[in-house]
Amino acid sequence: LSRGLGDVYKRQSYNRFVELQKSVVLHLTMFIKEVLLGTCTGVAYVDSTPLRVCKHQRIPIHKTFKGLAERGKCSMGWFFGFKLHLIINDRGEILSFMFTPGNVDDREPLYSESFIGNVKGKLCGDKGYIGKQLFEFLFMNGIQLVTKVKSNMRNSLMSVADKIMLRKRALVESVNDELKNIAQIEHSRHRSFTNFITNALSAIAAYCFFPKKPSISLEYVFDNQLTLF
């Protein structure tokens, strides 16, 4: 009993724990980048998800992230906060991530060498990543960008394997869902930017330790063609 009480006394209170979080931000970032990130398998998915910091009614009086958070628009409508840009492989492992203000174009992080340095092969994204300049830039870096075609664009030939991989793009949305609903990466209780970053990094680290992640099954047959199931 005395040993158990001693362990209780050594534990930090919630307020003290939050205060101590900021001292490990750099260490946590390095641990994620060097240890927890997955390995590229030749097939990757990219997507962005909003991280709201307050409700619409409180935007004019919000002070915590003044000058940092911005208004942005996603498929669910307008929001105020930041964006989390993710690249994952077919096993649901995070290959790279980046935080930006909410008004940043989804394509902009893909021009960053640090964001795409761990990616090779095919990179599947939604229509928001369409761009000739981006396609050429990624192609020169060993990445083939695969996206759907807009209705007002000229139709281009696409292999059956690429079409099937695009249908599996919901995989990255499942990862975003687990980060928000299980790892709690998004909430409006932050009182500083450091606290926001620490919580977000902690959620990403926690997801990397999940024993079971969303995934799709890929197999290479003997004729060197890619088959998806």
Where do the model's predicted regions map?
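Single conserved hydrophobic/aromatic residue that forms the stacking wall/gate
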Residues: 1-9
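Polybasic low-complexity intrinsically disordered regions
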Residues: 3, 33-151, 204
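Short, basic alpha-helical nucleic acid-contact segments in DNA-binding proteins
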Residues: 16-39
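Short, motif-level signal for alpha-helix interfacial/capping segments enriched in acidic residues
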Residues: 20, 24-28, 104-105, 150-155
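Structural motif
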Residues: 74-77, 189-200
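Anion-binding and metal-coordination hotspots
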Residues: 121-124, 137-142, 197, 201-229
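Helix-centered, glycine/charged polyanion-binding patches within enzymatic domains
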Residues: 122, 127-194
